[in-house]
Structure formats: structure tokens, C-alpha cells
Amino acid sequence: MANPTHSQVVAAPDSSGRLLRLVSASSVMMQLLGKSTNIRMSQILEHHEDEDFSAHRTKIVCTMGPSCWDVDKMVQLIDAGMNVCRLNFSHGDHEAHGRVVKNLQEALKQRPGKRVALLLDTKGPEIRTGMLEGDKPIELHAGDMLKIVTDYSFVGNKSCIACSYEKLPSSVKPGNTILIADGSLSVEVVECGKDYVMTRVMNPAIIGNKKNMNLPGVKVDLPVIGEKDKNDILNFGIPMGCNFIAASFVQSADDVRYIRSILGTKGRNIKIIPKIENVEGLLNFDEILQEADGIMIARGDLGMEIPPEKVFLAQKMMISKCNVAGKPVITATQMLESMTKNPRPTRAEAADVANAVLDGTDCVMLSGETANGSFPVQAVTVMSRVCFEAEGCIDYQQVFRATCQATMTPIDTQEAVARAAVETAQSINASLILALTETGRTARLIAKYRPMQPILALSASEETIKQLQVIRGVTTFLVPTFQGTDQLIRNALSAAKELQLVSEGDSIVAVHGIKEEVAGWSNLLKVLVVE
């Protein structure tokens, strides 16, 4: 059978017999495979230690933890390229995360021109094994029978362990596979009782207390937001000024709407980023994307739900659809995993980061590398360098044309002006695109078309400035007011000169609204020369 083309549907059967349909017909980056890069030998052979890699366009999300959460280390992370601070609520309490936020605020006082967004990552409907006798790991061998009970108070041993998911016996059936401890242990279901599941161990493994469990191909009957998550969002996320909620294990658009209802009026401006990490999330991706403000590709758990050789297809499909929708996408998990212990990444890891950039991701994320690793600052530095290099070999005109082709028409006035701004900037070889934006939409629409020029977004809203930290190619500048547009633009150009984004005599393209008092409707495009 011939290999499928990029315009065909790539399908893989999951454990339920359904087809996991990964449609790549709308792909922007995949359509340009082999055409969107312009690589010269000099780029490969030249190496400049003093090059400013902080100009990378792809944003970097750093997970907080003991290795990086003191003030001095945060300052170093900001200098190395951190744009978003991720608070992982699978670990730690409100007091600990509150100290992180306070330390970040102190660090930013030392870097007054920088902005770092806050992302609250929920624990979500996680399933875990229970405690073990004597807190000692158990050793299992292939062929062993292992009983899993739903009484979570049960203290386990090598023949029986507890599980936190009460509906496990009714959710799985004989023949299903259960993955434990990040997949290091696979067991096959052989019998389902009222309050237990009997399984057969498929491979030798040693597991400890409270390890995570995955049920590939099984729809887990747990709320996307539990009581702990509600408490974290309402009593920490909103009052502490978090800009994003990364919601774990989202399976449908209804899940996103439910989270929005929890946020209510007090949290109405917080952006929701569903994490796609199971088959249901993939199958319902289009409806989730339509309802969401962005997407996180959580490759760790996703790689347990679908075959590992399919993860890259899912990644490319999701990034492509986010690009066409003009919504930010974060690529996450094990990007520089070896740097938790080593000062240099594996070559495969560096290539993984670069390929995510070439795919079109807005952000790349570090997890244990910064939270618990021995080289957190080096990890961010490496990521900045790789992003910078990958961005330098993209054919932005090809990407622009493909994005225009993939975007359904008609488009609204604001997007038409944004698209025209990018095309004009290309035509006149402008050095910068300037966007005056109250809500951030103008800057997001310009960034959707991936101009080769940097985008400088001016906003009077600190909240908007923070939320633009996940948008690829956007640099932000806080202004006191939008009254007096011409003076604002002059001030912005002076700031751009200080940031070395433009020089005297350069052409720039500016986008803003005719009516200064009306937010969310930019309909004016100007071409200016820097004086």
C-alpha cells in the first residue's frame, strides 16, 4: 500500500477499535515540508558565542520548582528567555505557590522592562495507585497476577494494590491495557469485579507509592475540574492574578465551557488553555479548539494513550489547526529531559525543539528541566538558542501564503487589516510591525500570519500585555493611555530604537483603530519612516 500523502487522512486504531483520525489536510507547515526552509551552509558552520539569542520569537514556558524558584534564579531565567511561569498544582499548596509568585514579582522589579505571564496548571482528573506496605517499592514479574482494588485506603503489596478511581471496574473490560508509573508497568485486564479489577503483569517492573495510571482508549468518568481544582482556581488563580488556566485532561468543548462558568465574572478575562492528553481530547479537538483560548499539547500522557510513533502526527495536526485558527499552542513534555541531570541536551532533544518551532508552535515548555533539574538556567538558554536558529531558516513568505490559503473566507475587517499589514511589511521590507491593541486581538491576528518582522504590541492593559507573552513573534510595550495615537507611535518608535528593533531610516507598518476610544477594532494601516 502506498504511503499516505499530507492531504490524506492518517488513521490509527485505538484500543476501543475506533479510528483516531489525524487529519492533516489543513496543515500549514506540513504543506510546506521541504519548501519552507532556506538553509545556507554558512548558517550551519558559523557559530557566534556573543549572538543575542534573546530575540527568539518562540516563547518559553518554565515550570517552577525547588531548582529555580528563588529570586536570583528567576532573574537568571528571565535573562535566559523565560516568558511564562508555570505553576504545577499537581504538586505544592497555595502557600508554596504564593511564595513563587511573590519571588517572581521581586525578580521582575530587577528587570522592569520585562513581562512574565502566570499559568496555573490544574491537577485534573488524575488516577493514581495507593500506598504500599512499609512505604517500600514492590517488584513484579511478567505473568504475575495483580489485583487492583478501588478502596483507596487499602495498603498494597505485590499481589494487590489500591487505585483512586472508583469506577475502574465499570470503565475497563477484559483485554484492556492499564499503564502504571509513566508506562513502566503494563498490565492486562482479565476480570472485572464489583470493586476490583484482576490483571496480568505484562513486563517486569518495580513501582513505588502513588504512581500515575493511564487507561489507553478508555473514557474516564471523572470531572475535568474536581473540588481541589475549583479551590485552586477560585482561591489562588483569580486573586493572585494568573493569566492562564491550563486545564488537564480536557475531553470536550463542554469541559471548556464548564471551566469558564467556574471562573465567573471575577475570572472572565483569564484565558483557558486545554491540555490535550488523551484519545477523547484528540477526537474532539476541533470543538475544543473553537471554545478554547489556546491549546497545550501534553505529549507525556498523550504518548500513553496513542502509539508513540503517532505522537508526532498528532503534534503536527494540532499545531497546524491552532495556527490557522490564530490561537496560541504550547508544545510540552520531555523537550530537554536529559538536562535535568546533564548540562547539554541530547542531539535528538535539540532537534525536537527545532522541529516544534518549524511545525509552527507558539511556545515550548520546560517541566522537570527547570522545576527539579540541576541546570535550569542552561536549559532555558539552550532552548532560546535552538528556537532562534530554527526561526532563522523559515521561509516566511511561503508560510504567509499557506496561511492565507488555509484561512476560510470571508474574514472580518480586523483580520483583513492584519493580513494586509504583514503583506505590506514584506513588500516594503519593513523592519517592524507596530500594533496598538487594547484586547490583544490585533497583535494575535498579525502574529497568525507569521511575518518575518518582529511585532511590537502597545497596550494600556497590563493584563493584555501578560496574555501576549504566549504569542509567537510579539514583543510588548505598556503605555499609559491610548489617547493621542500619533504621540504614542512616536514614543513606541523611540522605545523600539532603544530595543534595537529599528534604526533611523527604517520603514515600519503601524496598525490601529480610527476611533481611539473603541477597543477591539483596528481598521487603519500606516507606513512610517523612523526618524
Swiss-Prot record:
Its EC number is 2.7.1.40. Its cofactor is Mg(2+); K(+). Disulfide bonds: none annotated. It catalyses: pyruvate + ATP = phosphoenolpyruvate + ADP + H(+). It is an enzyme of class 2 (transferase). GO terms for molecular function: ATP binding; kinase activity; magnesium ion binding; potassium ion binding; pyruvate kinase activity. This is Pyruvate kinase. It comes from Eimeria tenella. The lineage of its organism: Eukaryota, Sar, Alveolata, Apicomplexa, Conoidasida.
